[in-house]
Amino acid sequence: MWPREVMSAPLSRARAIAYDANADESRYLLDPQRREQYARSFLAKSQQLYGIRGATLDTYDDGLSTSWRAYETDHHDLRFTGEFRRELDNITFPGERAAAERTVDTYAAYQRDDRKIRALLAAGKEREAVEFCMDWKPGTSNAHFGAWMAALDKVTDINRAHITSSVRDGRSAVSDLLPWTGGLLLAAMALTALGLRPRLAEFR
């Protein structure tokens, strides 16, 4: 059984990267002078999460869709990398794969929202872009980000619940063995003493 910190590492990294990427998206809107910088940073973090060789922001969605369909057909297909890949390659518990796949589906929706935000800005609709990015109404970018984080939490919860259960069962098994172990130790000591008694008598 993997230690809890090892098994949860891709999930913890994915969450941290996700929040950083979401912040880059907001900065992209609010700091026109550095939009190119924040766009590059957002793409770099996206690649850390779900890596697609040679992808740009313009091609990322198609690459994600194509590689994900390939994975659904063959779980050994290696067309993408990143934290999602690490988690999907380390499925251990019942229900974990379905939950992990749900995180990719919600992530894909969030990525499509990002492209909509950039398209609105390019069309001169800055107010609409800001509203779509910052609002929490159903169907907006933040709402989809929340759904993505909830899906990620579900995977984490599955891992935590099973690991906690395994640790508890292990401790229970050890506790059950302790009385037997103590009894066997006392018996061994008694037998040893009995075996030495005749030899000690020789020196009297």
Regions found by a protein language model. Name each.
Residues 3-102, 128-129, 133:
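Membrane-proximal N-terminal soluble sensing/regulatory segments of transmembrane proteins
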Residues 18, 22-25, 107, 111-114, ...:
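Sec/Tat-exported extracytoplasmic proteins
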Residues 31, 120-123, 127, 158-161, ...:
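Soluble, cytosolic/nucleoplasmic coiled-coil alpha-helices used as oligomeric scaffolds and tethers
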Residues 81-149, 167:
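Polar/charged, Q/E/K-enriched amphipathic alpha-helical segments with strong coiled-coil propensity
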Residues 169-187:
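N-terminal membrane-entry
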